[in-house]
Amino acid sequence: MDKNKIMGLTQIEVKERQAKGLVNDFTASASTSTWQIVKRNVFTLFNALNFAIALALAFVQAWSNLVFFAVICFNAFSGIVTELRAKHMVDKLNLMTKEKVKTIRDGQEVALNPEELVLGDVIRLSAGEQIPSDALVLEGFAEVNEAMLTGESDLVQKEVDALLLSGSFLASGAVLAQVHHVGADNYAAKLMLEAKTVKPINSRIMKSLDKLAGFTGKIIIPFGLALLLEALILKGLPLKSSVVNSSTALLGMLPKGIALLTITSLLTAVIKLGLKKVLVQEMYSVETLARVDMLCLDKTGTITQGKMQVEAVLPLTETYGEEVIASILASYIAHSEDKNPTAQAIRKRFVGEVTYPMISNLPFSSDRKWGAMELEGLGTVFLGAPEMLLENEVPEAREALERGSRVLVLALSQEKLDHHKPQKPSDIQALALLEILDPIREGAAETLDYLRSQEVGLKIISGDNPVTVSSIAQKAGFADYNSYVDCSKITDEELVAMAEETAIFGRVSPHQKKLIIQTLKKAGHTTAMTGDGVNDILALREADCSIVMAEGDPATRQIANLVLLNSDFNDVPEILFEGRRVVNNIAHIAPIFLIKTIYSFLLAVICIASALLGRSEWILIFPFIPIQITMIDQFVEGFPPFVLTFERNIKPVEPNFLRRSMLRALPSALMVVFSVLFVKIFGASQGWSEIEISTLLYYLLGSIGFLSVFRACMPFTLWRALLIVWSVGGFLATALFPRIQKLLEISTLTGQTLPVYGAMMLVFTVIFILTSRYQARK
């Protein structure tokens, strides 16, 4: 090998490449840019339609009715500020988890960020690390998982001169490699550039609201023109009045408030979790977490502490005593590049003189469950799971497994090691058993019990022997510890058939972990997966939500939705419940927002239909103006729902968000429609003035909205009672203030309208209580 290559680039060569732009600066970030945040909050369908309506109102100089647009601008500004705060939190936490690349420059090893690499850099990679840039192997041997690029789960062997593809990761082994491509020339970058579709947002709430927005977006222009022409031509109203009335109907149909509150709530959850040392790399995963009903756990580092220690070494033959076994293990582990927790535990225990030089090495693989090394003067040494290397069961191994220990067998063969066709030899001889303990994480039992009490199904998926996993699960208080299967002895078809009913899966390969998750998803479960090793990556990517430990392999942190910076499994319930808080509270207050959407649509249809009847006295003009709706929104849709979204609510999430919310909002919307028709007809028969009719409708509209606020605040607490008093008090104070009355084009309820208001609200309250109780029973 060229010694200059091993020395790496000089600083002069690095600067030359930087000047030419040969830098690895094409990196995908978990955090969006500031410009993307601004675009997402400003350039939306809602804002475009609101802007068009505002232009129409400005054209006719209806300045007082443009207050709604100031609220829209404030909401957009608030969204930007909240999202920037969340971005700052995510960026800050990302710095804590960002993995450096070991790079050789001027003969010295330095740690660089992936984007600091230049063409020709020499990098050192080991098992568990993601490949930051396309590179050619200079030295070493590794097995690489390219599933994230090619979809193939089989490991690909990489020897000298082989090309390592960026975005893949080392499943085993270690190599020295030279950067072959940088930036947009990398294989992973080309895949991103060639992709014609953007990954859809995984949010059922936002998808539901998008459906509603799509419907209103299609009808809003024809409805707007119809309402404008009706008022202008058929009713003969001035242009200003026609624009104002038709604009109100269109504004009411847009469910903008609930969409903004949903995003704000999710961003707030990101910030809250960040303060608890949980990095949320995908905002909408918070909502997905709320819907999780099946949590799949990797045993190591989740239920256990992930702090392996060699408890005992048991020789199995008189030929090789304890001293010889220790010497073999010391040589094996000194030459080994394996850095998994088991290898680290052996390395810590067997530190000594290297007796046997290494000829060749086959790193440990989670697919094979063993590794091997050819040692000079000894033969080929194997280290791995007894059941994967030996034909017959060793009684001592069974006893250790039942104690909850991880058991490895040290074995010897005189056959040559073949990297290309790794298989156990026919002459293999067991030399010793290694019993390795991994203490159970403190509080794991309470956490598992709590999750079960919250209707979250639990499954343990591990590469360990199922007897070991079962024993540990029993100690951790796992109820179904007796329900286990050895996945190394069953077919994929059998695994699919057993996935739903079995609780513990042992000796699972990475492919099988993924298959279990796929099967559970097909059965209708929303799945979450916890893990920390490269053998978990395929399953983590397949799960609806992936949670990894910060102490785990770097490649797992790159693809996870959430990273536990404290690496503490006991944080999982709080993360789950933060998601439930957001989703349940949004579903709880959504009917308050949808009342306006429904009654605006129904009244617009009635107004257009009345124009088609042909009689001018039957023509109904939309009865509200924008400033009235905006003022009521501040006390009904504004402060109360916003405050209620912060309350703790950890009950399981109910399905069919939009359907349930629309049905709960429908009675109130129908009350508004009835109020408009009744007051218009009855008021005309009684000779009421337009200001009296407008005043009564304003009070009825606000009061019907408050019925939904009251329902959302049940059961009452002191804080909720104060919230209602503040909202109702603010509504009445503004409605009774003379200057604001002039702005709202209303007055005070009179001796004629007050009794009608009281009677109607009494009837509406009774109907509201009855319908709410009926819906609650369903």
Regions found by a protein language model. Give the residues of each.
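Transmembrane helix-loop-helix hairpins at the membrane interface
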Residues: 23-102, 346
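Cytosolic catalytic regions of P-type ion-transporting ATPases
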Residues: 98-207, 490-499, 503
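Conserved beta-strand/loop elements of the cytosolic catalytic core of P-type E1-E2 ATPases, chiefly
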Residues: 78, 108, 180-183, 196, ...
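Actuator/coupling domain of P-type ATPases
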Residues: 3-8, 14-29, 74-77, 85-88, ...
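Cytosolic catalytic regions of ATP/NTP-dependent phosphoryl-transfer enzymes
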Residues: 291-429, 436, 449-450, 458-470, ...
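Helix-interface capping motifs at the ends of transmembrane segments in multi-pass membrane proteins
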Residues: 48-70, 218-255, 267-268, 272-277, ...
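Membrane-embedded transport module
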Residues: 227, 338, 480-528, 543, ...
